[in-house]
């Protein structure tokens, strides 16, 4: 029995227990991981699918808008002199516009101060106005009675009214120069002063300015105007019009324009108001682009891609999704439907055709020709209750509505993920219980091994102590 061994005591079975627990949970863990990954991928794809549909809906809404087909464009022959825009109410036509003078704003230079570094104005009040608009009164005291202090106080008071002040130094000294953004007759800057006669070494009254009597600025220290506020003048098709602002919106019905410079005598600007054919084309192109984006996304998410002979093919996240197939069939059906009530019967008449992958392509020359030759027909094809944009939009709506098809699919997938989380938690509890059970059992086994080892040693020791156990003869 000296050579008999029945096991080794105090064995650590931790690694064995972990392997047994992992083996027990491996299949279910892999199953849940695969389900979670697939579901998450589908959820992401559905979100992107909804976004692509929404972008297509936006393009359809724009194309179905009367504003697109009723829009007018205004083009100037020289935008450095005149730039214009037009609303739907503008009538197509051509206008000859001569800019005789621009509307001007008031700019004045107050009396020069010979020694600005040492000048301290008397206490008092400045009241500045631009036409009928009065600025907040400025109180002059020791906190602001320098030239720089006056500048800052005027800028603060004139912020809302568009009046600003700066300091310019010339041969006569330094002076405040005030500017206004308001143009037109009667918008001159006026400065009224109430001088207390004390508190400084310089009369506050020197800052007074009356546009009614002030001369044009010239050499010397006296105040004067740099520019007077005055109306401008334009001539439209030979009709003269005085303008108080260089932004004009009340001369030609539905047309607004900004005049920037005076035209040369006898060289008027040509302003052309017409349909916005380019805007219509742009919206048709956006419709095609949005449709193609949606179609390409569907193609990518419903395809099976081979990745090698020894590997499983990669399938799109929405492969086999009935809602996707239904949408594709619906869109294609509407695109090939003929408009029996209009001169434009189908997309092909606009130079828009379907390619092999289901996307659309545009023959821009044919589209330009269709818009130019049959503008009303193009508008009728896309707009109204029976127009393509409305029909397609109605087909998209059930997919993107709140609690619609895609929301329901999303809710179902979210429930699946929630269920996966529940199963993962349950599996974790079950495996923890199994680990605890196995640990207990193997601890008992280890204790039994220890006991058997002790007994084996005791027997061996006893046998060795016997006379014949030592090898001696008796």
Swiss-Prot record:
Compartments in which it is found: Secreted; Bacterial flagellum
UniProt keywords, alphabetically: Bacterial flagellum, Coiled coil, Secreted
A Pfam family annotated for this UniProt entry: Flagellin_IN
Gene Ontology CC entries for this record: bacterial-type flagellum filament cap; bacterial-type flagellum hook; extracellular region
InterPro entries reported in the protein's UniProt record: Flagellin_hook_IN_motif, FliD, FliD_C, FliD_N
Coiled coil regions in record: 408-454
Annotated GO biological process: bacterial-type flagellum-dependent cell motility; cell adhesion
Assembly behavior: Homopentamer.
Physiological role: Required for the morphogenesis and for the elongation of the flagellar filament by facilitating polymerization of the flagellin monomers at the tip of growing filament. Forms a capping structure, which prevents flagellin subunits (transported through the central channel of the flagellum) from leaking out without polymerization at the distal end. Essential for motility. Responsible for adhesion to mucin, which is the initial event in colonization by this organism of the airways of cystic fibrosis patients.
Similarity field: Belongs to the FliD family.
Name assigned to this protein: B-type flagellar hook-associated protein 2
Organism: Pseudomonas aeruginosa (strain ATCC 15692 / DSM 22644 / CIP 104116 / JCM 14847 / LMG 12228 / 1C / PRS 101 / PAO1)
Gene: fliD
């Amino acid at each position: 029995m000296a050579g008999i061994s029945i096991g080794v005591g105090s064995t650590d079975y931790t690694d064995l227990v972990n392997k047994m627990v992992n083996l027990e949970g491996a299949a279910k863990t892999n199953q849940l991981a695969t389900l979670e990954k697939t579901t998450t991928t589908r959820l992401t794809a559905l979100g992107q699918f909804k976004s692509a549909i929404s972008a297509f809906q936006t393009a359809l809404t724009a194309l179905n808008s009367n504003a697109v087909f009723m829009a007018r464009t205004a083009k100037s022959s020289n935008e450095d002199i005149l730039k214009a825009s037009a609303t739907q109410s503008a009538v197509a036509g051509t206008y000859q516009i001569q800019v005789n003078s621009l509307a001007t704003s008031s700019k004045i230079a107050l009396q020069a101060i010979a020694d600005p570094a040492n000048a301290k104005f008397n206490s008092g009040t400045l009241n500045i106005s631009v036409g009928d608009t009065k600025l907040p009164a400025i109180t002059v005291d020791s906190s602001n009675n320098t030239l720089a202090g006056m500048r800052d106080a005027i800028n603060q008071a004139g912020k809302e009214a568009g009046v600003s002040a700066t300091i310019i130094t010339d041969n006569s000294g330094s002076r405040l120069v005030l500017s206004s953004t308001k143009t037109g007759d009667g918008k001159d800057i006026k400065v009224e002063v109430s001088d207390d006669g004390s508190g400084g070494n310089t009369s506050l009254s020197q800052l007074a300015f009356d546009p009614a009597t002030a001369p044009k600025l010239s050499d010397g220290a006296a105040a004067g105007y740099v520019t007077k506020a005055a109306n401008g003048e334009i001539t439209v098709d030979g009709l003269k019009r005085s303008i108080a602002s260089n932004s004009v919106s009340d001369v030609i019905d539905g047309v607004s324009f900004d005049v920037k410079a005076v035209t040369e005598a006898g060289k008027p600007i040509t302003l052309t108001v017409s349909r916005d054919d380019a805007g219509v084309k742009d919206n048709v192109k956006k419709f095609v682009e949005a449709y193609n984006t949606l179609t390409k996304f569907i193609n990518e998410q419903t395809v099976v891609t081979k990745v090698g002979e020894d590997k499983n093919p990669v399938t799109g996240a929405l492969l086999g999704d009935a809602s996707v197939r239904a949408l594709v069939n619906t869109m294609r059906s509407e695109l090939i439907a003929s408009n029996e009530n209009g001169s434009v019967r189908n997309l092909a008449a606009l130079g828009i055709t379907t390619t092999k992958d289901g996307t659309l392509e545009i023959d821009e020359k044919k589209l330009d020709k269709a818009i130019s030759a049959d503008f009303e027909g193009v508008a009728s094809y896309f707009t109204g209750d029976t127009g393509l944009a409305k029909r397609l939009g109605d087909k998209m709506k059930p997919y993107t509505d709140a609690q619609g098809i895609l929301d329901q699919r999303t809710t179902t997938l979210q429930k699946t993920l929630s269920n996966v989380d529940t199963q993962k938690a349950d599996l974790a509890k079950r495996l923890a219980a199994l680990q605890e059970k196995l640990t207990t059992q193997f601890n008992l086994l280890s204790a039994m091994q220890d006991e058997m080892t002790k007994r084996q040693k005791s027997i061996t020791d006893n046998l060795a102590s016997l006379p014949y156990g030592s090898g001696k003869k008796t």
